[in-house]
Amino acid sequence: MNATIFALLLLLNLAMYNAAEQSSETDMDDTLLIPENYRKGCFKEGHSCPKTAPCCRPLVCKGPSPNTKKCTRP
């Protein structure tokens, strides 16, 4: 009985592995590419830039003092 259960689990594992492998094959046309310049969590030009989140590329965090830094072009 233990051998039967083991064999069934092995077959189920192989079936799930094959299904997962086939579903992971995607075309680049089907995927949505997000530009790195506007990734989630970055600040746009003119926004104050605390240490918690970076400025969107190619912007840099500049300012005369740490409290007045803003995202600006380099």
From Swiss-Prot:
Location of the protein in the cell: Secreted
Name of the protein: U5-theraphotoxin-Cg1a
Description of its domains: The presence of a 'disulfide through disulfide knot' structurally defines this protein as a knottin.
Superkingdom classification of source: Eukaryota
Alphabetic keyword roster: Disulfide bond, Ion channel impairing toxin, Knottin, Secreted, Signal, Toxin
Similarity comment text for this entry: Belongs to the neurotoxin 36 family. 01 subfamily.
Function field: Probable ion channel inhibitor.
